[in-house]
Amino acid sequence: MDFLISTSLSESTSTSADFCVVCGDKAIGKHYGAVACNGCKGFFRRSVWQNLQYTCRFNKQCNIDKDHRNACRYCRFQKCLADGMKPEAIQNERDRIGSTKRRKRSGANSENNSDSEGTPSPKIEVMGNSVSRKLIEMLLDIEHRLASNQSMNALLRDESEMKNSRQRAVNYLIGWTNMLHPLPEVPLADKVLLLKKFSSAFTLLGTLQRSMALPHFVLPNDQVLSISASHPPELFEALTRIIDELLTPLRRLRTDHAEFSCLKALLLLNPDVVGISNNTRERIREARDALLKTLFAYMSNTQNSIDASLRVSSLLMIIPSLISVSSSIMEFPALSDLFGLGDVIKRDTISPKIETPPLEMKPMMPKIAQPPVTSAPTVPTNIMMNKDLISQIMNNPQLFPLLPMPQTASPPMSFMGQSEFGCHLQSMPVKVILS
């Protein structure tokens, strides 16, 4: 989706009044039906173009003057309307401008027309609300399909596998990979590189999402891990780092489900992974750029452009910490098993295989005791597979019928590449068992 970029047309000025009827600042002419300064003109146009909704934190009678006009956007917008500014005048201006894709920005006009107070800059209009909403809904639908799929739930909540966080995490990850465009269509070798790079961070992000409103961690197998000073120092330090660097920022932002889904998709849609093909790199870059525009548009529905930009930046800054923390957890096998952060693919093998695991998942960290969790006894009833993990799952959907897969290998393209999904290929799911 392309950004729509336009610069406003020069407007006729008026010398009949010297002061803005909204805030009392020096006026630059008559705009949208009222004599206004450049700041109030830009504020009113932004509010109407982006359909921004404001709220007043006080009694809806805030003083709007030159020094306090930015204190309450709700009262400022209401004063714009009360003093004669007409929203329909802005629509008429947009009609005169026409399609911005066929226009070149004019430097002379941009100097005389500005959406900011004091600093001229071109107006950026993000993709339409309906388009961005559609992509957000599609990402949320991936989460819903994975959470509500009866075959998956029956498999992952089997009494004999209640302890296996890693098992649940890898099934969840590959479910996303099978549904997020363009990953189902990229070469196998590129999928391997992407999953090797970001599987741990992706899984940890899911645990953070489940733990947002709770004082403890909710692991992939729905068990609870509490933080206690009685834990060994190394373990306590690792858990504290998760809280300080990840959970606290996410809670401070009050990250919602849509934003979590976007973060998960952004983790997997990283075009900078070393070794992927140029064609895959370009396809992933296009999908990522569309997702970033969508995330900005989603946030712009409830706040102004500056605040939306800051929020997008704050969320993106969490990704490097997510990758760093998940890598550090991998140094403690017992803890990484609990969080389901085991590698999907063995990093030290050129042709990755699924090795036969021991009958019971045992901690491999002698110096750090595994944190106590409530669990059921483990019964070794796993189905073993000894062929290439990724090729079996990605290239043969019948080995992983946990999701409604496309009926063709390359489904008809719609927004972000998603089309209608077919029925289950097989009623009995097969589980991928990892060592």
UniProtKB/Swiss-Prot annotation:
Provide this UniProt record's keywords sorted from A to Z: DNA-binding, Metal-binding, Nucleus, Receptor, Transcription, Transcription regulation, Zinc, Zinc-finger
Record carries keyword Magnesium: no
List, in alphabetical order, the GO biological process terms annotated in this UniProt record: cell differentiation; defense response to Gram-negative bacterium; negative regulation of protein localization to nucleus; regulation of innate immune response; regulation of transcription by RNA polymerase II
Give every NR LBD domain span: 131-355
Q: What is its main location?
A: nucleus
Superkingdom per UniProt: Eukaryota
What residue intervals correspond to the zinc fingers (NR C4-type)? 20-40, 56-80
Q: Where in the cell is it found?
A: Nucleus
Region described as Disordered: 91-126
Q: Name one GO molecular function term.
A: RNA polymerase II cis-regulatory region sequence-specific DNA binding
Q: Which Pfam families match?
A: Hormone_recep (PF00104), zf-C4 (PF00105)
Q: Output compositional bias ranges, type Polar residues.
A: 107-119
Keyword Transcription among UniProt keywords: yes
Q: Tissue-wise, where is it found?
A: Expressed in intestine and head neurons in young adults.
- Tell me which GO cellular component terms the UniProt record holds: nucleus
Annotated knockout phenotype: RNAi-mediated knockdown causes enhanced resistance to infection with the Gram-negative bacterium P.aeruginosa. Knockdown suppresses the developmental delay phenotype of hif-1 mutants when grown under iron limiting conditions.
Which SUPFAM superfamilies does this UniProt record tie to the protein?
Glucocorticoid receptor-like (DNA-binding domain) (SSF57716), Nuclear receptor ligand-binding domain (SSF48508)
Any idea which residues the entry calls the DNA-binding region? 17-92
- InterPro entries per the record? HNF4-like_DBD, NHR-like_dom_sf, Nucl_hrmn_rcpt_lig-bd, Nuclear_hormone_rcpt_NR2, Nuclear_hrmn_rcpt, Znf_hrmn_rcpt, Znf_NHR/GATA
**Cited function:** Orphan nuclear receptor. Transcriptional repressor of intestinal metal transporter smf-3 and genes of the innate immune response. Inhibits nuclear localization of transcription factor pqm-1; in response to pathogen stress, may facilitate translocation of pqm-1, leading to transcriptional activation of genes involved in innate immunity and iron uptake.
Q: Which family is this sequence assigned to?
A: Belongs to the nuclear hormone receptor family.
The protein here is known as Nuclear hormone receptor family member nhr-14
Annotated source species:
Caenorhabditis elegans
Gene encoding the protein: nhr-14
